[in-house]
Amino acid sequence: MKTLLLTLVVVTIVYLDLGYTTKCYNHQSTTPETTEICPDSGYFCYKSSWIDGREGRIERGCTFTCPELTPNGKYVYCCRRDKCNQ
């Protein structure tokens, strides 16, 4: 009986993936592609883009709250899946 209970607990942990953390891209527009693991499961991946002079800039990473859109021409995209901010 104890073995069955232990097996059910292990299977539950594996399928629920307790302690899951999100993996996000964190490179800027001019650097090679890199990723980071967000510190907690409540985090979003974000991608922020804007025009700086004549060049487009992109910033990526993890954030606990999705940044609000601002009227300064900055575009922000948030998501919660692994590497969804490419």
From Swiss-Prot:
Source lineage: Eukaryota, Metazoa, Chordata, Craniata, Vertebrata
GO molecular function: acetylcholine receptor inhibitor activity; ion channel regulator activity; toxin activity
Keyword Chaperone: no
Quaternary context: Homodimer; non-covalently linked.
CDD domains: TFP_snake_toxin
Organism: Ophiophagus hannah (King cobra)
SUPFAM superfamilies: Snake toxin-like (SSF57302)
Tissue specificity of this protein: Expressed by the venom gland.
Annotated Gene Ontology cellular component terms: extracellular region
InterPro entries listed in its UniProt record: Snake_3FTx, Snake_toxin-like_sf, Snake_toxin_con_site, Toxin_cobra-type
Protein name: Haditoxin
Function text: Antagonist of muscle (alpha-1-beta-1-delta-epsilon/CHRNA1-CHRNB1-CHRND-CHRNE) and neuronal (alpha-7/CHRNA7, alpha-3-beta-2/CHRNA3-CHRNB2, alpha-4-beta-2/CHRNA4-CHRNB2) nicotinic acetylcholine receptors (nAChR). The highest affinity is for human alpha-7/CHRNA7 nAChRs (IC(50)=180 nM), compared to human alpha-1-beta-1-delta-epsilon/CHRNA1-CHRNB1-CHRND-CHRNE nAChR (IC(50)= 550 nM), alpha-3-beta-2/CHRNA3-CHRNB2 nAChR (IC(50)=500 nM), and alpha-4-beta-2/CHRNA4-CHRNB2 nAChR (IC(50)=2.6 uM).
Record family assignment: Belongs to the three-finger toxin family. Short-chain subfamily. Orphan group VIII (haditoxin) sub-subfamily.
Keyword set, alphabetical order: Acetylcholine receptor inhibiting toxin, Disulfide bond, Ion channel impairing toxin, Neurotoxin, Postsynaptic neurotoxin, Secreted, Signal, Toxin
